[in-house]
Amino acid sequence: MSGPLVLLAAGGTGGHLFPAEALANALSRRGVAVELVTDERALRYGDTFPARAMHTVPAGTPRSGSIVERGGAILRLGFGVLKALRLIRRLKPAVVVGFGGYPSVPPLLAASLLGAPTVLHEANGVMGRANRFLASRVDAIAAGFPLDDAELAAKLTVTGNPLRPKALAAAGEPYPAEDGRLRLLVTGGSQGARVMADIVPAAVAALPEELRGRLVIVQQTRPEDMARVKAIYDGAAVAAELASFFSDLPHRMAQAQLVIARAGASTVSELAAIGRAAILVPLPHALDQDQASNAAVLKATGAAEVVRQEDFTPRFLSGRLAQLLSDLPQLHARAEKAKAAGVADAAERLAELTLRTAGVRPAAVAPARI
């Protein structure tokens, strides 16, 4: 592909790579070449990430561990900057776009030192530490949710969080028809969460028999928790599909009337774009309390209830489920509120900001394939 090159910088986890993938697709439709610089974890996505080339640079997380471990992380970041400097001099990208996490620091810092245009995307409702370090050094900042930061206001644009193609497709699915079944999706993140395995089955087992007989549960469960979770659902005569990973999770979300989940940026953004009611349990003890900030955005719309993990008990959840599952019109109303807050075209908004920052006029946009 000829034309300008955009270099994306993202850590090798789904929370960083999903929005980077969505932007890569949006840029490709505009005739823009995309390459990815990341860490070794992202190599497993090499066959699916829409970039013409992938590059790795050393990176580390200097915020935890012993003094020796933190020192080693800083050294790795330093080596990463040197490697990124060589890479950017060779590639000469029109702009470098970072998606957070410490693996994005070397490429963005190197681009800033070389005077290359830079864009930083913050997915969460509060800026993470790596992004805070980079914020004053970049030319433009895109935010998934509104950020309350007067110092950054001049360079800040709320684009929303770019959605992966499967989530965009799910956003077009209709709300589940009322057929007597009660559809519940339970997910705890890319690897599942033990708290969901500990709390949700016990809460469901305590529901009245009439509700249990109508429930259809899809639950993401860690392999080591699978047997005990299945045993509880079987004992309660509840239909449940369990897996450690669902490749079609956005579609499963669209099929549900209620979702119980953590509050990562991708989860909250997909809940809003698809439009589903939710009970959110933010990950506790996070340094930046990013999930609590994300959950607050959806709570403010009236689409979600937010529960602290310490209050997330079988007794509490069983009571909330009994009330919510007995009032399907309320769940539908909450879904509509979520949908109204969704930003389905976030990838297009971010693509336009990226190209404006680069000073590039894009070619005609090809239709999205979802």
Q: Where are the regions that the model predicts?
A:
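An amphipathic, basic-hydrophobic alpha-helix
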Residues: 66-95, 113
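Active-site-proximal region of nucleotide-activated glycan assembly enzymes
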Residues: 33, 41, 112-172
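C-terminal alpha-helical cap of glycosyltransferases
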Residues: 323, 343-370
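An aromatic- and histidine-rich active-site surface loop
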Residues: 41-45, 95-114
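Donor-nucleotide binding loops and adjacent catalytic segments primarily
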Residues: 24-29, 35-37, 41-51, 57, ...
